[in-house]
Amino acid sequence: MSTPGKAVLRVRNLHKEYAAAGQTTVALNGIDLAIEPESFVSIIGPSGCGKSTLLQIMAGLASPSSGDVLFGTIRVQDPPRDVVYVFQQYTRSLFPWKTVERNVAFGLENKGTIPREEIVARTREMIGLVKLTGFERHYPWQLSGGMQQRVAIARALACRPAVLLMDEPFSAVDALTRAGLQELLRSLWHKLGLTVVFVTHDVDEGVYLSDRVVVLTRAPGTIAIDIPIEFPNPRDQIATRALPAYLDYRARLLAQLFSDEGLKTGEAA
């Protein structure tokens, strides 16, 4: 668990309610969470537990009903310049009329204060880091799903964010592409010293990628458990997943999720 003094992003007693058709639905109930610099934190939980809502509030894209989020010492009310969000639906977040190069450069150009030479250099650097050199002049619709998501990641990282928020970014690709994107993300995390908050439905993905996993209960979402994941680095898709410790973490997280759903191991659907 991170300490308040070290947190780059801090959620304090956060509640979120929605009103519809004369009824109030509580989505999040009393969330307290501190994210340390250069940590990789995954948030998992059942569908509808408020994972994406929490991430949107952390990004300044939605407002809490009560409680707050701090980026450093600044209360988040609008999207902070140094916090970047990668969406699940990459096909909707990329501009189909812009090339890979222009998509990646978009955030830098939008700042309006970065010299053109630096924009070109950083764009080229990020395209290289996500292994898309040679595809600079391609359009999103000419790329595979995994390549499109790499463009979205490159665009986010070109802005050199302090915090990268990712909402199920690999859920729409096949298993092999997902494994490749996982390796790419972990490599970039280490190389660039990123702070990552990663929402996923996939327990295995959370355990493999992270150095900490937070489990939310079914709505109204609260934190059920928050555990550190301690594996040696670098990790390996086969060897790491075969470690007894990996299987123990996985079993512990699944037990929590099953318990919240009122299920037992081996129970038929």
How does the language model describe each region?
Residues 67-79:
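Conserved ABC transporter NBD signature motif
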Residues 158-162:
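A short, proline-enriched helix->beta-strand linker immediately N-terminal to the Walker B motif
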Residues 164-167:
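Catalytic Walker B motif of ABC-type/P-loop ATPase nucleotide-binding domains
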